């Protein structure tokens, strides 16, 4: 058996911020849009985390409803969906279109989704039933409205797929169920298919070859791999097997668990973010954990019953780390929000399980 690998990652770029962003939108040119809970401004960054512009776009959180920002694949349009409206601006933040709707309830809301050719955009608004709308962008006309099964019970997240005529709609309902839909569309038709095999799964991403989709568990379930385009289950990694590794985190009262995030970093390897703030590595083919990423400046510390850091093994009740969120960006790098208030980028080497 190959030895468990610890892979150190030096910081490539970092940007100190006054507060961690409520949302990070990854742009097609490798840059980013940041918005914040308590500030109305949006900051545009380039791929090196240098500021391009900063503008008041009223993108703050209101009544516990985040503003969700989406950019079109050609970077010409920006969509902002908040508590009471969906807005579209140009790439400089100038308003082009606005759709007002009833307020979302606390912690609900919807993102937006642009088609690959920037011909259409989709969003959900709260009506008697939450309704999925398709907007034709050439004249800003809503051409489809599809009532969904719930009303003010879900948040709505969109994900692109390798097929430009299909996308995914995820509907997490707080601490309750998570449902995933596959949406197919043409210029004049749209269908929704519930993917029941993905119930209570958190959407991850597609492998770079476009053949496999990964999901993280909502609670104690397994990490799942699904084929594409069939979306059939091809593999599962139960958490008890993922964490069956000989390491130093055995003293906590509750064991480590997956923290809602599993992401492909290449065609052979996926990353699993854990409750203890760890970045575990697993092999796509054997579904075994073989290593851990150690990003520079991101520590995992032991805590005692009072929530204070401790080095006394007999006092340890839990562990926690510095990583708040992580994503894989357009360049295949690791993008992290850090507990210090910094945004950090780490280059990822080519990583795969070693064979012996």
Regions found by a protein language model. Give the residues of each.
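A short helix->beta-strand "capping" segment at the edge of beta-propeller domains
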Residues: 1-20, 47-57, 308
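Repeated scaffold domains used in trafficking and secretory/extracellular systems
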Residues: 16-26, 60-71, 104-114, 148-160, ...
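Conserved loop/turn motif of beta-propeller repeat scaffolds
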Residues: 29-30, 74-75, 117-118, 164, ...
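Hydrophobic beta-strand positions that form the internal "hydrophobic ladder"
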Residues: 32-33, 78, 120-121, 167-168, ...
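Structural motif
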Residues: 39-43, 84-89, 128-134, 174-182, ...
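Beta-propeller fold detector
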Residues: 53-57, 96-102, 144-149, 192-197, ...
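Solenoidal tandem-repeat scaffolds enriched in leucines and small polar residues
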Residues: 119-208, 215-219
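Blade-level signature of beta-propeller repeat domains, shared across WD40, Kelch, NHL, RCC1
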Residues: 320-356
